[in-house]
Amino acid sequence: MLFERARGVFPGGVNSPARALKHLAAPLVANGASGPYLYTDRGRLVDYCMAFGAIILGHAHPRVKNAVAKQLERGWIYALLTEEEVAYAERIKAHVPSIEKMRIVNSGTEATMNAVRLARGYTRRDVIIKFDGNFHGSHDYVLVKAGSGAATWGVPTSAGVPQDVIKLTAVVPYNDVDAFVKAVREVGGRLAAVIVEPIAANYGLIIPDREFIKALREETERAGALLIFDEVVTGFRVGLSGAQGHFGVRPDLTTLGKVVGGGFPIGIFGGRADVMDMVAPSGPVYNAGTYNAHPVSVAAGLAVVEELERGEPYKIANEAAERLARGIEDIAGRVGFDVVVKQIASMFQLYFRRGDVKTPQDVRESDERLYLKLHELAIKHGVYLAPSQYETNFTSAAHTRDVVETTLAALEKAFTELKSQVGK
């Protein structure tokens, strides 16, 4: 069995914890992907994980394949400046006005790590504020639990994170203006930056109030701190200008990833020119990497951005998410479940609960047991949903109306079977 072999060479048998799918007998094994479909050891599945949001055009999109193939013909790494990376950066800058200059790295984790380092270097301050339920990668600066005030700041969420590192990170309730303002006052003149997912997509899907996003901008400006929007998930998915375009708020720094790499490893941190000019070699904040602005990732990313500029991919993907959100709520209600579906652009998530979802606590209070059972049954009926209520579902330009209707029919079977298993 492949999983047994995998456990002999990988911790837990996988190379990222979310792939473990512990509620299943064994993880899914992928054999290929095309359009909206994953091909797995459980058969063909309509994919709504989409590589945790990295794929927006559909798997193995022809334009991306062609761009990558052309790059491979010319070689795949030079560790030198290329015309393609400049053209790519110019396209990013054209759509995200807050990014005046940028550095192209290799992952969202690298992007946020360097953005935090840069903010500290620019402001010459050391404390950052992040939010409960927001995920910014797997580096030490941000692996911090939520607390209830200054006395409880600095509790790590991972073994191996030094106390001296994470005591400089304060965690504040998400979508809570009063708690945020209080935290800014408590930190005072030590505050270097506030880092936030402007739409939280790594703890389910939480769409904050506009007043909250507005307060982030106002309070950081008042405090002389930088505002960092982590748009690794939302960048070029919510639209060409991301969540910052949706809310009409201009951060000082932005991080991007996922969609802008077309499924290849990439990360970007960028923002105000005066801040970015602090990055080496023009300034004292160090960043370097053999694989920075990797030609293959840049080629794939540029192909995706150019395709998105047509507008049609967004129209198809967003309509699919809207139809799924309405359809799932309708099916769940008819079968006899209390379900809330949150949706924006081509992202959606469903929760077994009554009442809205506005905070991470609302997500925690939803019935995770039912979600995991539904996830397993959906696979049985040919649909791969996000593997936890703490993740987000994504649609793509390959999720046509026919695919959506097939999905809803399959989910009706899954909900009905779930009802027969759990009863009233």
Curated annotation (Swiss-Prot):
Its EC number is 5.4.3.8. Pathway: Porphyrin-containing compound metabolism; protoporphyrin-IX biosynthesis; 5-aminolevulinate from L-glutamyl-tRNA(Glu): step 2/2. Pfam families: Aminotran_3. The modification N6-(pyridoxal phosphate)lysine is found at residue 258. InterPro entries: 4pyrrol_synth_GluAld_NH2Trfase (IPR004639), Aminotrans_3 (IPR005814), Aminotrans_3_PPA_site (IPR049704), PyrdxlP-dep_Trfase (IPR015424), PyrdxlP-dep_Trfase_major (IPR015421), PyrdxlP-dep_Trfase_small (IPR015422). Gene3D superfamilies: Aspartate Aminotransferase, domain 1 (3.90.1150.10), Type I PLP-dependent aspartate aminotransferase-like (Major domain) (3.40.640.10). Its cofactor is pyridoxal 5'-phosphate. GO terms for cellular component: cytoplasm. Coiled coil: none annotated. It is found in: Cytoplasm. Belongs to the class-III pyridoxal-phosphate-dependent aminotransferase family. HemL subfamily. This is Glutamate-1-semialdehyde 2,1-aminomutase. It comes from Pyrobaculum neutrophilum (strain DSM 2338 / JCM 9278 / NBRC 100436 / V24Sta). The gene is hemL.
